[in-house]
Amino acid sequence: MDKIEVRGARTHNLKNINLVIPRDKLIVVTGLSGSGKSSLAFDTLYAEGQRRYVESLSAYARQFLSLMEKPDVDHIEGLSPAISIEQKSTSHNPRSTVGTITEIHDYLRLLYARVGEPRCPDHDVPLAAQTVSQMVDNVLSQPEGKRLMLLAPIIKERKGEHTKTLENLASQGYIRARIDGEVCDLSDPPKLELQKKHTIEVVVDRFKVRDDLTQRLAESFETALELSGGTAVVADMDDPKAEELLFSANFACPICGYSMRELEPRLFSFNNPAGACPTCDGLGVQQYFDPDRVIQNPELSLAGGAIRGWDRRNFYYFQMLKSLADHYKFDVEAPWGSLSANVHKVVLYGSGKENIEFKYMNDRGDTSIRRHPFEGVLHNMERRYKETESSAVREELAKFISNRPCASCEGTRLRREARHVYVENTPLPAISDMSIGHAMEFFNNLKLAGQRAKIAEKILKEIGDRLKFLVNVGLNYLTLSRSAETLSGGEAQRIRLASQIGAGLVGVMYVLDEPSIGLHQRDNERLLGTLIHLRDLGNTVIVVEHDEDAIRAADHVIDIGPGAGVHGGEVVAEGPLEAIMAVPESLTGQYMSGKRKIEVPKKRVPANPEKVLKLTGARGNNLKDVTLTLPVGLFTCITGVSGSGKSTLINDTLFPIAQRQLNGATIAEPAPYRDIQGLEHFDKVIDIDQSPIGRTPRSNPATYTGVFTPVRELFAGVPESRARGYTPGRFSFNVRGGRCEACQGDGVIKVEMHFLPDIYVPCDQCKGKRYNRETLEIKYKGKTIHEVLDMTIEEAREFFDAVPALARKLQTLMDVGLTYIRLGQSATTLSGGEAQRVKLARELSKRGTGQTLYILDEPTTGLHFADIQQLLDVLHKLRDQGNTIVVIEHNLDVIKTADWIVDLGPEGGSGGGEILVSGTPETVAECEASHTARFLKPML
């Protein structure tokens, strides 16, 4: 088989298409946003490839795998097992880091456990073995008469029942052993659980400390060391919590006797109690109630709400503050900022041991007086946060929590012992904090000698390979300790791609979703090289992509179209690029051949030096004290290679500051900065991202854009409705009354199938129409509410032409190019690009003040050349109303049409974080140091 044959694919909007795809080639699927590319690549080819592979497993194994729906297709042959690498958001687990996802951290743990050199944390000297005499002297230096026992560790944290071990010890004449911390008789040992980890230490000797024990102790120690293979523990018999003495014939600090357990990989894992920092449990950060978040506005008084929930509206807590004010002689009506530092301290952190007289009045007006210390607002919040069982209280209090690096482990996540093991004078945390490019250099230059070199050889090869793949997909600026939560979709996808190349599989079908997202043109070539490498191993690589270079690099291009949604779903052209360019109906072909192109604007809007937004001293992540100047009322692009600090500057600094000052938000905490000027030119800030407009099937474009309410009002105003007394609520499928109760207005019923994917069957009461029969009897211009929800935006625009409020909102959806989606289409079925355009349409339909600051992060994700043209028209329209638009973007077609560009760099990670140049595209294109300039110049 050298081809994959698809016959009769009808998934989503595909129109019964037939295709022959060559195997072991690089195939690019392209077309307008919403034309059916993902339906073909993911929901048909990948879903069927995965399903067939999973069907071959046992029913028991299948229930643990999330199965995809069986695609609606007549026949596919020539498929291989499929692996998809999607844009889906990364892990939200705070324990995942770049190092753990790529498995590099696992190999580093192994390396440090096998060839690391432990040192004493206090004296920084390598640990050396202790002799029996040293051990005896140490024990005899304990207070005389202290009852101690000498233990030999036999089994450390291993699963099993260990019956044989316990029988052997008893037969050797030992009477007691300490099992999982409890001392018990070996004649009647407890039954151990097979699946739990156990620790068994045999009691070799029990004694009271006195001077004439030297000979006896020396013999006991020799026995213990022989039994355990070189370690012994001395424990206090009277106080099980007392610190135990650890002895090692292997290594210990000669100065203070600090010794550590044998090095094992789990000592270097922050996800294992053996290695995690005990203070922060291996998270690297500690949560605390932040006074700056609790006191949002120091100009308010305590009575007026300086501390939310403690003002005069909250009677109970306000009584406490009044009693406190009487005791410390301060005024609850005075602004918080004017009160003394001592008052601040007492209110926030409590009165310590000092008793204060509190007057409490209950609902009936009875007063009681009690004397007790005041716990402090922050301690009160901490206590309520720990004790509460209500998720609402927890969520409310979580708004006041900030994170700070853990003081014990300084944010490295590891316990003290693990931080003091070195390979060539470098501890593990130092390697985790290196960028991937830097780490690769370190391992290339690492020279180990003798036996250690032999042990480390294989481990180093694995680490080196993985680092190389990450560098090849353009991620050399990330550090291994970077938390997975902070990665962008494109970065996470490329990390998964790098792990796949590391796996080195052959004969697999890879399906990728726009791997070039968030990647600067400079890094694009390396990414394409990686995809070609995957193909050359003998895999079929199918990529959904709009990037010009990717389309040119493909062996076979499939153009889906001609339009989007109901107007798409057909194969417009397929074959090598030349064949695509020759088809006049193919939009992709026309843009690729240059017959159509996005024009450079004839004239740009000039900047007004009087009106600027100026952010000074931004220092978040890798930013180096940056000063950003944005002209007000212009369309500005923020550019720079991946990792240069664009998102930190705009999403983590500018947006939260503006959100706090313009929208009055309290949650967003901006990255460190010195000052901001010029926000008076704006009345609000809006971030338009690609996150879904709703996470449930009940959200849809009609509810999100506010079209649904006037539609329901129209239906409620029909004479028949008025006669029956129907209100607009009758026409909502979210509340009782008008909806079909059998499916609760969903239109489908979910049937759980345990070994198969859950299936959704149309509700047999309403036949999938979501409403009950009576509601569907009401018609407006001959259509029922269900038929209206089933219209495309284009049809609805025509249908409601006479209703100006609706026509205007629907027209904006048309303007952003969403002519084809249905009014009632579930939000979960919209692509990221579509969701973003629904949000844009909602903004356009508002009566604008022309003073809004819009922030967009890579709006061209998922957009075809023709879609980008539409997006630019919308953004230019918003700008022409006087609004300011700031876009983070790599797409050169967008960059060349901007009025102003701010370019960050020169490199990613620690090599970036500076503003190289800002000005018009023509100015920026002349900058020698800028990578963006190199690619932008030919476009102008």
UniProtKB/Swiss-Prot annotation:
Protein name: UvrABC system protein A
UniProt keyword annotations, A-Z: ATP-binding, Cytoplasm, DNA damage, DNA excision, DNA repair, DNA-binding, Excision nuclease, Metal-binding, Nucleotide-binding, Repeat, SOS response, Zinc, Zinc-finger
InterPro entries, sorted: ABC_transporter-like_ATP-bd, ABC_transporter-like_CS, ATP_grasp_subdomain_1, P-loop_NTPase, UvrA, UvrA_DNA-bd, UvrA_inter
Gene3D superfamilies: ABC transporter ATPase domain-like, ABC transporter ATPase like domain, ATP-grasp fold, A domain, P-loop containing nucleotide triphosphate hydrolases
Job of this protein: The UvrABC repair system catalyzes the recognition and processing of DNA lesions. UvrA is an ATPase and a DNA-binding protein. A damage recognition complex composed of 2 UvrA and 2 UvrB subunits scans DNA for abnormalities. When the presence of a lesion has been verified by UvrB, the UvrA molecules dissociate. Plays a role in recovery after DNA ADP-ribosylation.
Compartments, as annotated in UniProt: Cytoplasm
Similarity comment text for this entry: Belongs to the ABC transporter superfamily. UvrA family.
